[in-house]
């Protein structure tokens, strides 16, 4: 049985040279004409079409109803399932899509662990417009809502429900 500690052995076949050594990003670009690691907004590598911290995902998260599960890597998941359907459920044909999904999930979990929060709320605008007289800012409510989400993971309950 192969040693699982060596991550190079776990690479899909399309990412290996003929002699079995892993390809560099430049070799992958030359062979397939695709940049698998496009630079993200902040100069970090991005491995797939999904970006868990993108503004569109933040807005989508805020639009979810109570207790609805939120998956920031839904697009990568759909792509891998569609690939399986197209290829008669042969997993070997869809390794690239599975790797993209795994990388998205890793990025999501690492971001969550590093920051302690799923999203940064400083760039989210007030959906109701400017706060009127007597209203509090919208941002503290978002922070409280996200904090409750972090505590419950798959079940999202509004902060007001805990204030009863």
Swiss-Prot record:
It is found in: Mitochondrion intermembrane space. GO terms for cellular component: mitochondrial intermembrane space; mitochondrion. Residues 1-19, 36-49 have a biased composition (Basic and acidic residues). Keywords: Disulfide bond, Mitochondrion, Transit peptide. Residues 1-50 are annotated as: Disordered. GO terms for biological process: mitochondrial respiratory chain complex assembly. InterPro entries: COX23 (IPR051040), Cys_alpha_HP_mot_SF (IPR009069). Disulfide bonds join 73-104, 83-94. SUPFAM superfamilies: Cysteine alpha-hairpin motif (SSF47072). A motif (Cx9C motif 1) lies at residues 73-83. The keyword Acetylation does not apply. Residues 70-112 form the CHCH domain. A motif (Cx9C motif 2) lies at residues 94-104. It comes from the Eukaryota. Belongs to the COX23 family. Required for the assembly of cytochrome c oxidase. This is Cytochrome c oxidase-assembly factor COX23, mitochondrial. It comes from Yarrowia lipolytica (strain CLIB 122 / E 150) (Yeast).
């Amino acid at each position: 049985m192969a040693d699982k500690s060596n991550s190079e052995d776990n690479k899909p076949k399309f990412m290996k040279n003929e002699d079995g050594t892993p390809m560099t990003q430049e070799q992958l670009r030359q062979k397939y004409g695709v940049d698998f690691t496009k630079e993200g907004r902040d100069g970090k590598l991005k491995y797939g079409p999904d970006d868990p911290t993108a503004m569109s995902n933040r807005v989508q998260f805020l639009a979810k109803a109570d207790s609805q599960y939120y998956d920031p890597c839904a697009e990568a998941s759909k792509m891998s399932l569609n690939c399986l359907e197209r290829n008669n459920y042969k997993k070997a044909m869809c390794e690239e899509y599975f790797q993209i999904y795994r990388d998205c999930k890793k990025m999501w979990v690492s971001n969550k662990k590093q920051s302690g929060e799923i999203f940064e709320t400083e760039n989210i605008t007030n959906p109701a417009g400017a706060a009127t007289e007597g209203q509090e800012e919208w941002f503290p409510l978002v922070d409280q809502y996200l904090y409750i989400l972090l505590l419950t993971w798959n079940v999202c309950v509004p902060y007001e429900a805990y204030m009863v």
